[in-house]
Design a protein with these regions (language model features):
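Short, glycine/acidic-rich beta->alpha junctions
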Residues: 2-3, 94, 161, 243, ...
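C-terminal flanking segment of RING-like E3 ligase catalytic modules
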Residues: 275-276, 281
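Glycine-rich, proline-tolerant flexible connector loops at the mouths of alpha/beta enzymes
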Residues: 22-61, 114-131, 183-188, 205-206, ...
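N-terminal capping/small domains of soluble enzymes
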Residues: 1-83, 87-92, 276
Length: 281
């Protein structure tokens, strides 16, 4: 929902206080995303959406276009928060280069995407970094060395103990952590075609699971970090199945400073924030 200025403007017009700009990558030819069905859904006994699966990658829009739009959005909405999600190879120079470009936009902060479980982890990014606390610490330290922007580390739930990665973020000097990213999953199997679903070009794949069904997992992991002595005091951004103000309040009750919402916005629209504002007031 926050992949371009058009959608970010809609979010701010609806009343959202800030956005997480869809993950940017390195300069050069844009990444080629999946062409075809990128999503799968899990419904309960009625049409209510319980879980949502995606195998989408990071932005497939040119870096220069994204950066120019971020500059304009900050000019148009100086009182709103714009944090830019980033994912580049686990190389110091790659991070140094992207940090300089993002800092020039006037963005309020960066979120290090160490959680994506599909497509990018096979390239040594995303969850491949987030599952190794030493890598989390190393990249967070690079970001604090080369940028003055507030640095948030987004954590993967696809790990035995999420506290180990959170501790790495703290040691690296991160200003905050966010969790959870999506959970590695296979949405189902098309028994007629004997392929995982969703499938594109006769090929299926695992993807990232989110939506209301993951909220209990997210709450547990958040509470683990909030109660950890080595992570004491670090701000936490809660993610995972937040659909209404009660969900948001539950995350905050367990230690979140704020919450992020994606799936519910995709399914119900930006104006769901109105109920959240009323309820939390």
């Amino acid at each position: 929902p926050t992949d371009k200025a058009y959608n970010v403007n809609r979010a701010f017009e609806a009343g959202w206080g800030g956005v997480m700009w869809k993950t940017l990558g390195e300069a050069g030819l844009p990444l080629v995303n999946v062409s075809g069905p990128r999503y799968g859904a899990w419904h309960g006994t009625d049409p209510t959406l319980m879980g949502f699966n995606n195998m989408e990658l990071i932005t497939d829009r040119d870096l220069e276009i994204n950066l120019a739009e971020i500059i304009q959005v900050k000019k148009d909405w100086p009182d709103r928060g714009v944090v830019v999600s980033l994912m580049v190879p686990c190389e110091e120079q790659a991070w140094k280069d992207i940090l300089m470009r993002v800092e020039d936009t006037g963005a309020d902060g960066i979120e290090l995407n160490f959680g994506c479980p599909h497509g990018m982890s096979e390239r040594g990014m995303g969850a491949a970094v987030g599952q190794v606390p030493e890598y989390v610490e190393m990249v967070a330290a690079w970001c604090k060395q080369y940028s003055d922007l507030a640095t948030i580390v987004k954590l993967t739930p696809n790990i035995t103990d999420i506290r180990t990665s959170a501790r790495g973020a703290v040691r690296g000097g991160a200003d905050a952590v966010s969790l959870i990213n999506t959970i590695n999953s296979v949405m189902g199997v098309d028994l007629e075609q004997m392929k995982m679903s969703p499938s594109v070009g006769q090929q299926g794949s695992h993807g990232g699971y989110c939506g209301p069904a993951v909220k209990p997992i997210a709450l547990h992991m958040l509470s683990e970090i909030a109660g950890d002595d080595e992570c004491k005091g670090i701000p936490i951004s809660g993610i995972g199945g937040v659909s209404n103000w009660r969900d948001a309040a539950e995350f905050m009750a367990l230690g979140a400073s704020n919450v992020q919402v994606c799936t519910a916005v995709m399914t119900h629209g930006f104006r769901i924030v109105e109920d959240m504002i009323d309820g939390l007031s």
